[in-house]
């Protein structure tokens, strides 16, 4: 098949998932055309069946805000027309599904059929989509997509509730390449006996970074640990300032990385205290690296992180509950090791080899 994938090119979960999906589809013999405003951070173009098409938005002084959706739609039409594309798979409803629908209509006038599959990732529904400015456009985009998928049952239910839509939504969870993480685990050697607690995110307010830093501070006062924070975003400088003011020891703000598995393999506990989280791809990658998981109980996280089995779930703003959960693991090597092993077993259920065929089946259903 010849497939267009439209995604955000950033370190966020939707862009990472879309990129890894494209890589695996190419390995399976499909031709994959990525469209975005810049090259996705994890995109590897070494495979001759992967192509990247940049969306350029020409500046025109009449517009206070340059029309990205129009430029994206035009690029989709151009790529689809020149490459005999079978379908388009958009990740994140706004503006991608909306732009895909406009492109679909333009192509129809040239007697070219372009079916749309839209994957909902979370904040496109729970935050952006609920905003009055965007709600009608999001609902329209969902209803006009040929197939809609979501990354968790929680997100599926939220979508039906928020938008009062009867659109059928198929749950296809996020995935992880277990083989890649296994290879890293085999090479990984702990440098010392100090336990490491890690967080990975895009440092947006929804990730609840300020609560995280307060949790780290209380743990630091009671236990000798390392604290790793991977990622960048709007709350990063606030987090650094808080860590300095609270005099947290052994904390490392590591920035963005394309090789998160090299950090996670040295980690023991992963914490994700998000205010809302449709799935928690970062937590899944930590599970594949044999980390016990401490997370909030919001959104799709309880579907992934099974309380008292792979880790603990807490109310998102309950600092004391997070601290208590972490200390239970730090003071019981037996419990920590059991949770780490359970996490790894849970991650295997989400192996890329199990999940990508689910997308392929939907593609075949679209073009049959």
List PLM regions with ranges.
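Conserved donor-binding/catalytic core segment of Leloir-type glycosyltransferases
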Residues: 149, 190-216, 228
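An amphipathic, basic-hydrophobic alpha-helix
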Residues: 61-87, 97-98, 102, 132-136, ...
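Carbohydrate-associated surface elements
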Residues: 154, 175
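A short, well-ordered alpha-helix in the C-terminal region of glycosyltransferases
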Residues: 321, 328, 335-349, 358-361
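Short hydrophobic beta-strand element within catalytic cores of glycosyltransferases
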Residues: 292-295, 305
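Conserved acidic donor-binding segment of nucleotide-sugar-dependent glycosyltransferases
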Residues: 307-308, 312-319, 328-333
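N-terminal strand-loop element at the rim of the active site
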Residues: 5-11, 18, 23-68
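Aromatic "clamp/platform" in nucleotide-sugar-dependent glycosyltransferases that forms part
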Residues: 256, 275
């Amino acid at each position: 098949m010849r497939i267009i994938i439209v995604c955000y090119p950033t370190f966020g979960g939707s862009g990472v998932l879309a990129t890894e999906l494209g890589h695996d589809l190419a390995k399976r013999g499909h031709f994959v055309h990525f469209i975005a405003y810049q090259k996705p951070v994890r995109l590897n173009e070494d495979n001759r069946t992967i192509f990247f098409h940049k969306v350029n938005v020409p500046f025109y002084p009449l517009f206070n805000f340059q029309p990205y959706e129009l430029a994206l739609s035009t690029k989709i039409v151009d790529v689809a027309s020149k490459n005999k594309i079978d379908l388009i798979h958009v990740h994140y409803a706004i503006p991608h599904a909306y732009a895909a629908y406009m492109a679909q209509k333009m192509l129809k006038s040239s007697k070219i059929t372009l079916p749309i599959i839209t994957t909902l990732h979370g904040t496109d529904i729970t935050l952006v989509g609920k905003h009055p400015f965007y709600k009608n456009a999001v609902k329209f985009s969902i209803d006009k997509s040929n197939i809609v998928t979501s990354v968790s049952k929680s997100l599926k239910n939220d979508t039906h509730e928020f938008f009062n839509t009867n659109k059928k939504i198929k749950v296809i969870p996020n995935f992880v390449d277990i083989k890649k993480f296994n290879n890293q685990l085999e090479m990984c050697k702990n440098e010392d006996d100090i336990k490491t607690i890690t967080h990975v995110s895009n440092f947006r307010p929804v990730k609840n970074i300020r609560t995280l830093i307060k949790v780290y501070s209380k743990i630091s006062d009671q236990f000798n640990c390392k604290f790793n924070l991977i990622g960048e975003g709007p709350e990063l400088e606030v987090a650094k300032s808080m860590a300095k003011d609270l005099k947290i020891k052994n904390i490392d703000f590591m920035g963005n990385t394309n090789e998160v598995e090299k950090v996670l393999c040295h980690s023991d506990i992963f914490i994700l205290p998000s205010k809302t989280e449709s799935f928690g791809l970062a937590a899944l990658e930590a599970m594949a690296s044999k980390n016990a998981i401490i997370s909030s109980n919001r959104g799709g996280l309880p579907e992934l992180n099974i309380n008292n089995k792979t880790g603990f779930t807490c109310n998102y703003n309950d600092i004391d509950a997070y601290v208590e959960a972490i200390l239970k693991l730090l003071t019981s090597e037996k419990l920590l090791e059991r949770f780490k092993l359970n996490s790894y077993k849970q991650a295997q259920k989400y192996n890329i080899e199990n999940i990508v065929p689910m997308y392929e089946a939907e593609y075949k259903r679209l073009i049959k």
